[in-house]
Amino acid sequence: MGFFSEFKEFAMKGNVVDLAVGVIIGAAFGKIVSSFIEDVITPLLLKPALDAANLSTIEQLTAFGGVKYGLFLSAVINFIIVAFVLFLIIKAMNHAKKKDVAPPPPPAGPTQEELLTQIRDLLKNK
């Protein structure tokens, strides 16, 4: 077996392909979730804090060395959403793989003629 054929066999194994798909989907979906969190969720969460501090923008809230808890919340929410969606994708892929694999056929037992032959031989020996 040559080097390239061994590499091809390794690369085409299910685990390597699944890992590659997971990384690509995770990166692409991560950007979507980041945009959703930063552009939609974070402003909604920080709006009450801005109103309480009589400020108009998020930048004013952190201009004087304030804690950027909004960025931390954004990262946490981002991680939770990406992890949950990847869990659902992997669960669906595993479910699909289980359907594709046919159960092995039951072991072939002796035929009726073989059983009758065995019974006849046992009766002869008595």
Curated annotation (Swiss-Prot):
Keyword vocabulary terms for this entry: Cell inner membrane, Cell membrane, Ion channel, Ion transport, Membrane, Transmembrane, Transmembrane helix, Transport
Q: Where are the transmembrane segments?
A: 17-37, 70-90
How does the protein's chain sit in the membrane according to the entry?
Multi-pass membrane protein
Q: Where is this chain's protein located in or outside the cell?
A: Cell inner membrane
A single Gene Ontology MF term assigned here is: mechanosensitive monoatomic ion channel activity
* GO cellular component, as recorded: plasma membrane
User: Major location, coarse class?
Assistant: membrane
Q: InterPro entries from the xrefs? A: Mechanosensitive_channel_CS, MS_channel, MSC/AndL, MscL_channel
- Annotated Gene3D superfamilies: Large-conductance mechanosensitive channel, MscL, domain 1
Q: What does this protein do?
A: Channel that opens in response to stretch forces in the membrane lipid bilayer. May participate in the regulation of osmotic pressure changes within the cell.
Family recorded in the similarity comment: Belongs to the MscL family.
Under the subunit heading, UniProt states: Homopentamer.
- This chain belongs to which protein, by name? Large-conductance mechanosensitive channel
Which organism does this sequence originate in?
Flavobacterium johnsoniae (strain ATCC 17061 / DSM 2064 / JCM 8514 / BCRC 14874 / CCUG 350202 / NBRC 14942 / NCIMB 11054 / UW101)
